[in-house]
A protein has these predicted regions:
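C-terminal helical subdomain
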Residues: 178, 185-186, 197-236
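Rossmann-fold cofactor-recognition segment
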Residues: 53-70
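Conserved glycine-rich Rossmann-like NAD(P)H-binding loop of the short-chain dehydrogenase/reductase
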Residues: 32-48
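Conserved Rossmann-fold cofactor-binding substructure of NAD(P)-dependent oxidoreductases
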Residues: 65-82
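N-terminal Rossmann NAD(P)H-binding glycine-rich loop of SDR-like oxidoreductase domains
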Residues: 18, 22-28
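Conserved N-terminal Rossmann-fold NAD(P)-binding element of oxidoreductases
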Residues: 12-16
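Catalytic loop of short-chain dehydrogenase/reductase
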Residues: 93, 97-113, 121, 128-129, ...
Length: 236
């Protein structure tokens, strides 16, 4: 059984924690002693309430659909008086893996790109001022978002959405040149989740604790980094 650390007084705003990697991140940071505000899209889809029982007083659950700007604005208003040592956005959907850019419908392409690229960056724009100069701003990307590493093709729409996210985050960092905060694009590896599938080589338990350790080790390192869960730099 994992040891649960006492409260450290540090705070995380985790956007997208209803299941999979996001849920595991919420659990890991609670175990590390952080106070966590975690968001879900629908209360009926989340197991987070169970974590709230296990970590009494250190988990708050908010509901938001980040693809709806009005809901993002409302959440920002609810949290206006708060500060967070770490803002981390975890959002991801994919289309049929076999669809090429020639096959995908416009509506499906828009759904994936809005969820995976536009909406996470809107959240970062809305909430970044709640992160102090010593804090960290991070977003879950994918190794498939690397243009340099795209030798095999496949997953065309998903790759494009994560590459777009990486580019938008890089533009955000350029616009905030001189910002002392750490900024991170985190690639968790291919993990066995509902989205990753049963054939993925990594378990959630093999990825997320190491990813959290990597994120925490970057505190105080200004500028943007694109890292995998082990802390290795991913080529752009």
């Amino acid at each position: 059984m994992s040891v649960i650390a006492p409260s450290l007084g540090k705070s995380l705003l985790l956007i997208g924690a209803s299941r999979g990697l996001g849920f595991a991140m919420a659990e890991e940071y609670l175990r590390l002693g952080w106070n966590v505000v975690a968001t879900i899209r629908s209360e009926s889809q989340s197991k987070l309430a169970g974590l709230g029982q296990a970590f009494k007083g250190r988990l708050e659950i908010e509901t938001v659909d980040i693809t709806l700007p009005s809901e993002v604005t409302a959440l920002r208003a609810r949290l206006a008086s708060r500060t967070f040592d770490l803002l981390f956005v975890n959002a991801g959907v994919k289309n049929d893996d076999r669809e090429t850019i020639a096959d995908v419908s416009t509506d499906e392409f828009v759904r994936v790109i809005v969820t995976n690229a536009l909406s996470p960056m809107r959240v970062i724009e809305a909430f970044q001022d709640l992160v102090p100069p010593t804090g960290t701003i991070g977003v879950m990307t994918s190794g498939l978002g690397s243009v340099a590493n795209n030798q095999a093709g496949s997953y065309e729409v998903y790759r494009a959405s994560k590459a777009a996210l990486n580019t938008l985050m890089r533009s955000f960092a350029a616009r905030h040149a001189g910002d002392p905060r750490a900024m991170l694009l985190m690639a968790p590896g291919w993990v066995r989740t509902d989205m990753g599938g049963v054939q993925a080589p990594l378990s959630v338990e093999e990825s997320i604790p190491k990813l959290a350790s990597t994120v925490n080790a970057q505190q105080g390192k200004a500028g943007l980094q694109y890292l995998d869960y082990l802390g290795r730099t991913v080529p752009w």
